[in-house]
Amino acid sequence: LKLRYYQRDAIDSLHHWFANRPAEDHALIVLPTAAGKTIIFSHFIKEILAKDPTARFLVMAHRKELVEQAETKLKTVWPDAPVGVLAAGMKRFEIDSQILIASRDTLASPKRLDAVGSFDYMIIDEAHNVPPSSHTRYKKIITTLSDRNPMKVMGCTATPYRMGQGYIYGNRKDHFFKGLAYSVSIPELIRNGFLCRLSAYAVNEDAIIDAGAVALKFKNGDFKESELEKIAMVDDTILQVINDWIDNAY
């Protein structure tokens, strides 16, 4: 699998970051959706293990789909990769794997955190989900494992900010990531033919939800999905959205 120029640049930037920064300086790479973030960290893992066959990796994601995607992409890059999965939703508990792709919620239990041992590198997919609060599952996992062994940590995201916090990297106390190891923009990837140009269409105004008319509850700086579903998942709205999509997409 031939890497695109920016994917190679991102990997080289990560190597440089970890070679020149202390372990507590966590790195962030920012690439648009569909730029191949999973391909990047899969190649990065393979290159590190080629130099240090004893290194151990934890890839952490918060959704089952992201766990499955990470395993698939890693095996595409490296079919014989020593990879396993820890995810209750997939009924897989391969905790001794050299490359462990783990569901955040499955790993967060004290029993499993104790059982997985230590890691040299941690990769966090969809890193904007790491909240500033220290009393979260993410922080519990990271703190516990870092106390066990000072891991080198990197995050991947297309959106390096959170509501109520702003950017998730920098030198403030609530910044988990110390800086950008690498980033590339949507316009650059469009210009170079790696992403399609965008065409945006507004849906029929009959389908627009008046969220201001309902007292929606927040959770971790965002609307609660269950609250949104109450006003969004209704037949008239869904039908109008589907009709608009068909009219504009075909």
Q: Predicted regions span which residues?
A:
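Conserved interdomain linker/interface between the two RecA-like ATPase lobes of SF2 helicase motors
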Residues: G179-Y250
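N-terminal pre-P-loop "Q-motif" helix
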Residues: K2-A23
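Walker A/P-loop
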Residues: R21-F44
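Conserved Walker A/P-loop ATP-binding site and its immediately adjacent core
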Residues: A35-I40, P53-T76
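Conserved helix/coil segment N-terminal to the catalytic DExD/H
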Residues: G89-Y121
